Each structure stands twice: as C-alpha cells, then as structure tokens.
Amino acid sequence: MSTIHPIVDQVTRRIRERSAESRAAYLEQVDAMAARPPGAQSMGCANVAHAFAGIPGGDRIRIVEEKAPNVAIVTAYNDVLSAHAPLARYPDILKDEARRLGATAQVAGGVPAMCDGVTQGAPGMELSLFSRDAIAMGTAIALSHDVFDAAMMLGICDKIVPGLLIGALHFGHLPTVFVPAGPMTSGLSNGDKAKVREQAAQGLVGRKELLAAESAAYHGEGTCTFYGTANSNQMLLEAMGLHVPGTAFINPADGERELLTREAMRSVLAITRNKRFAPIGRVVDERCIVNAMVALLATGGSTNHLIHWVAVARAAGITIDWNDFSELSGVVPLLARVYPNGSADVNQFQAAGGPGYVIGQLLKAGLMHGDVLTVRPDGLQEFARIPAVDNGQLAWHAAEVSGDLSVLRPADAPFSATGGLKLLSGNLGRSVIKVSAVPEDRHVVEAPARVFDSQEALQQAFKAGELDRDVICVVRWQGPRANGMPELHKLTPPLAVLQGKGYKVALVTDGRMSGASGKVPAAIHVSPEACVGGPLARLRDGDLVRLDAVAGTLAVLVDESEWQQRLVATMPRALRQANGRGFGRELFAGFRRHALSAEEGACTWIND
C-alpha cells in the first residue's frame, strides 16, 4: 500500500483533532447501543408480536425462536424517479436472499424521494434541499422500531443518499449496506440535449422539439446518464466502502444487477454480530470522509456534495469545512471527463474502468486511505476491482488500465493536476465553483453586475434582450433561510446562449446549481447568504464584480469605505411570503428558520 500523501494526511489529522470531542461522544453512543441485546430480544412480548405479525410464519420462527438476524430495508422507491423505479423489485429479492442465508428481512419504512429534474425551476424545488433532512428523519423513524440487527438502504438520487446516510449514522450501531440500481442505458447524448435546450431558450425550436429531445435523453429506468449529484453519490459510496464493490454503474436490466443486489444481503449479514462486526458508525470515520472528498474532487463531481457531505460528516460526529476541500483540491488530480466535465456519459465512464479504476489509481498515488473499514472483508482495495459474471457467479478483476483515455486517465497523467472544485473568497463572501466543467479561458470574468431577486426575473431580462453584454448575473435571496436554497439549473441555457455570443458571462448566487450544470462559470453557495445580511445584500446594478477561479477570489471592485457604508438590502416582504406559501412550503417554515449556512451543511437538525 502506498504511503499517504502528506497533504491528505495533514487534512485528515486536522479533521480528527477538530472533531475529537464530538466524535468521541458519537462513538460512545454507538458502543452503548451496540452493547444492548440484539434486535427483538430486548423488547417486550407485545412489542415483538406487533413487529412480526405481518410477516410469514417461517420468518417469525427464525427471528423469535432461532434468534436469526433481522435486516431492516429502508426504501426510497417511487416510480416518478426513473432511478428509483427498479427498487420496486428489490425487497422481494433481498428477503429471498436473507431466507437462503438463514436470516430475515423486513421493509422497515419508506422515505420520500424527489426528482430535481421534475421540479427544476418550479416551486417544488424549494423543498428539494430540505427533503434531505426529511429523508434522514424518515430513516430514523423506520429504524426506531428497534427490532433490527442490520440495515440496507435503497436509494440513489440527489438528496436521497445523503438523507439515508445521515439517518443511518444516527443508528451507527447497525451494520449497513447501500444498494443502488444503476444508470439508464445511453440515449440522446448530453451534449446534443444541451444544444436543443439552448435553441429553445432562443426560440429557435418549440416545445414539441424540446420534449422530443428530452424524452430521447431520459428514456427508461435508471439514473440520468450525466455525472451529476445522483451519480456522484454512487461514486462517493464506493469510495467510502458502503456498497458491494463495483455496484454503482451497472444498468438496471443487466443480469449482473440482481446478483449484486443479492451479494449486498450476503455482505451485510457477514458483518452482523460476528468477529468482523463493522457497524456504519465505525466504518464512517475521518479517513472514510476524506476518501469521499478525494473521490469527489478526482472525478469533478457535483458541487452539492460540498453541502451534503458536511452534513453527513456532522452526523458521524465529524466536522469538515470548505477549507478542507480546497486544500485537498490542490493535490488531488482530475482523473475523469464525464458530462458536464466532458462529452462521455456514465456508461462510458463505467466501460472505461469506472469507480474501480479511479479508486485504484488514488490508492496507488497515496491520495486515499486504504487502511479503513468497509462492508467487505479486505478493505478499500476490494473497491479497486470491477465485477463480472463468470458461470453464473460474481467475480471481480482488477481495474488497472483505463479502457478509454479520453474518459479516464491515470493519476500520473491526469486531465488536470488539481481537483474539479474550487473555493472562492473575498468581500462578497465564500463560495464554490466547479472549474472542471468550465473552459480555462472563462475561469476569470470581470464585468458589471446585474442583480436579480429571483431566477424568473433573470429569465425575463434575458428574453427582453437586456443581458446582451458582458455581465455577471447575481441572483440573491436563494439561500437555505430565504427559500430553501433551490437549484438554478434552468438558468444555464440562457446564460450559455449569452456566452456563445462572445460575451463574458458568469453567475453569482447564494443558491445552488444542479450537478449537471457547467459550461458557464458560476460562483454558488455564497455564504453568508443575503437573507441574513450577507454581502450580496449590498450589491447594486452596475457594480464591477470579479470572479477569479485561478486566484480563488470573488470580489466587488468598490472602494472599501463606500462598500462598508452601503445599506444592506432586506428581502422583500412579498417575496418572503410568496416563498413560504403553496406546494407544501408552509410545512417547511421551521426548516427555513433554523437551517445552518451552506458551508455548515444547511443542516436543520443541529441544536448545539
């Protein structure tokens, strides 16, 4: 095993020291829960009878009399999400495999799952970020029945995996395995789809043509094929050792998929109450979190994870921040070019070697911790392999060579010497930018600001021809406390059109962008947000703003004394009221009121 890179080691040590007190308290709770009698053995007879009244008699005998392990299944199934539609079949497969192995499994509960592709640019998007914490709560409710010896998490998409993971970590005494469903097969390329969207933004094609293109891109079961938040989730789970190795990007209809799903049950039972007892609270330690951060940077993954994984770490008693990401980004090379960071989709990424190749390269370069617990017996090295079917059985082989150097490159000959995400700071606050998706000649933009209070206002200005010039579009009142921090991906086509006309264009916002966003430089997650008096509340139309992804700065070029004397705008009352009404947004008022900043994970459940 390679010697760990000194910067990776330094960041890990700093996180460990920073988190010493909270991590110790977390592990004390995990150990106390693990020390109790397992599952139903600690419950009263009436409680036990209620828990198992609805399952087959044979399963009841196994649990009550034979004291066999009982595995909780928490599912995010619905068939609005193409990625989650295959999960309808999984509980029966997992229960069958549990019985084969002398155990039992129950669906402990279902959690909501929102498709950001459906709600993009719509009021429902303002529930999207907070759905993560609602999912975590739903996971906790499911597991609170407390009749389980292990857990399996069925979920794939944007907020679902972080929510399931946060919830599972609050039951850190349970061995836990995540079970994905894989991407849909390739349809219309992501690049061609983007071109049609830009044509539609200009009025060159109509709704019929746009819908045909979108339907050709999104055409079946599985995740979207771009490397956005959903597929970044899967890469990070592989790097954390919470999957069966190589499970992430096998298509739902591939015969290998069911074998991998069954293997997930075998894996979780293998670490349940035996010599290799590995509860999720022990698996997810500082090294595991750093491995996830490195994987994100090395693949140019979704900016959303700079929020979500801060929250995930907090759930395990670990504190990370954007400085940690920034320092790692300086030494972690970019190994992958997958849309929006390139033209390939995730199926081509998988064919080139997928997560197995990436993890193998990062381990070899000393950029990942190999000495970690995972859900497999041989540690993270097992995740540097690719699964295949040999005579009806799963077999794994080493992913040592890239199958396509235009998609995946080795660590000693990367696409870039530094990672795909970068921290920006200055008198406009702290923000992040996904540089891997932006051509280098657009990494620095200096232009007058045009300030908007909503994404709809920006779109109206674009349609009116008011933005045909060099411009930095600022969209404020989009943070967690303002309106739930929606994604503003609908702004990508009009801004890309302006950029295509030769103008210098950028977006600055305290909101989020989709993991699919790219092409146009965007300083996002600006903190502190305007709603709490952050610097964006001081900006005015015409202020000269400089976004410099090379130097890592975001600043308004105004005399400092004038800047400090500026009045801080307040969120218009009518806008605040509109953001809190309709589409169930009233129910999330408490979330908006108590949400932490983006850099703190936008958590709604931290009370210290």
Feature locations, PLM:
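Acidic/charged coordination and interface sites in well-structured regions
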Residues: 89
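Contiguous domain-boundary segments centered on the initiation and propagation of an alpha-helix
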Residues: 132-139, 144-151, 459, 463-470
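Catalytic or ion-coupling anion/metal-binding cores of large enzyme and transporter domains
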Residues: 1-69, 75-79, 83, 92-111, ...
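N-terminal small/polar loop signature for handling phosphorylated ligands or for N-terminal nucleophile
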Residues: 108-146
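A short, small-residue-rich loop immediately preceding and capping a beta-strand
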Residues: 139, 143-164, 175-179
